[in-house]
């Protein structure tokens, strides 16, 4: 029987050398293990990541309180439950915590248990996790958003915008798309080196050179695509792919440079320029006309609903507008966005909400309302590759899991290669069809 016999948590280190929670779930006949990621630029509406706050130990970032919550309160409550009853398990976790933002037990405690239970349930059922969650229809490999150049909170340079990404959508298989991304990554490295710029990589494996402007950053990426021998889209594509193989995606992380007191977007790392919400929306409108941009994530700040509305009206018909800090994988926030008519896509980060069931609910709500979903990592990752399984399980069609370096990022890409191989002729790579613009 798949009855939970023990839940055991421990403190491990993530890809930035910070503590995080890992959970083991044991049943009478199966086992599941999951490790929890952590973000650098976090939305104010995210579920609470419980940290110890003892400055003398791991600079206050220890997670022993969360570990203790798993090993006592959660273990005692869930032992004896059927591991295959995921919704019941997740509801029990929510009831145990009893707060709207998981601040009592910690979202990092709840998520580790939720994901480990799913893995134990999959093992008991004799199924890969993507089949266990998604059933027989789970067969879509995601188009990757590959973060090759960094700025903002992810880099100590003069670039305001956090992530410049490539999306190899013009291919028939995930493996070919991955090869394209890797070759562009190496072409970009050679290009930076030829210009005497740094090729050190940041938290997510992307380069973070000291550039003169935000425009130089995107232009370098476009140049690297060409040097790798691939065709990039053109502004005349209006967000479409045409016969191009690669498009650009951005994550400016606009909340990070929004001054709520001034109600201005301040380019504090580069020109010191200050823009109103309307001017910021017009700025992105110009970029979407000048560059082959298919997707912009967090183009406006997390609580600038009016700015989001203007941006959506201006370019939402031809550019995927992804809400990350805006929606924080929260169905209530997403429902508000749908009602207001803002954005057209949601970034899905499992640790923003805290349980697998809530994550799947948000993806389902997005699908029912014509919004796309992008399954995402965090800047602080581990070797855990659950998000690769979730991307295929939900047929999301897109994944954001870093650059083409660092083994914590490669773990997800390599898992997707294995899934594609396992699916064989059933595997489907959506390419341009992953977008609804």
Swiss-Prot record:
Enzyme Commission number(s) from the entry: 4.2.1.11
Species lineage: Bacteria, Pseudomonadati, Chlorobiota, Chlorobiia, Chlorobiales
A GO biological-process term: glycolytic process
PANTHER family per record: ENOLASE
Assigned keywords, A-Z: Cytoplasm, Glycolysis, Lyase, Magnesium, Metal-binding, Secreted
Residues that, per the record, bind Mg(2+): 251, 297, 324
Catalytic activity: (2R)-2-phosphoglycerate = phosphoenolpyruvate + H2O
Role, per record: Catalyzes the reversible conversion of 2-phosphoglycerate (2-PG) into phosphoenolpyruvate (PEP). It is essential for the degradation of carbohydrates via glycolysis.
Residue positions of the active site: 204, 349
Identification of the protein by name: Enolase
Pathway: Carbohydrate degradation; glycolysis; pyruvate from D-glyceraldehyde 3-phosphate: step 4/5
GO molecular function, one term: magnesium ion binding
Location of this chain's protein in the cell: Cytoplasm; Secreted; Cell surface
Source organism of the structure: Pelodictyon phaeoclathratiforme (strain DSM 5477 / BU-1)
Xref: InterPro entries: Enolase, Enolase-like_C_sf, Enolase-like_N, Enolase_C, Enolase_CS, Enolase_N
Ligand binding ((2R)-2-phosphoglycerate): 162, 349, 378-379, 400
One Pfam family here: Enolase_C
CC cofactor: Mg(2+)
Cofactor, free-text remark: Binds a second Mg(2+) ion via substrate during catalysis.
Gene for this chain: eno
Cellular compartments per GO CC: cell surface; extracellular region; phosphopyruvate hydratase complex
Similarity comment: Belongs to the enolase family.
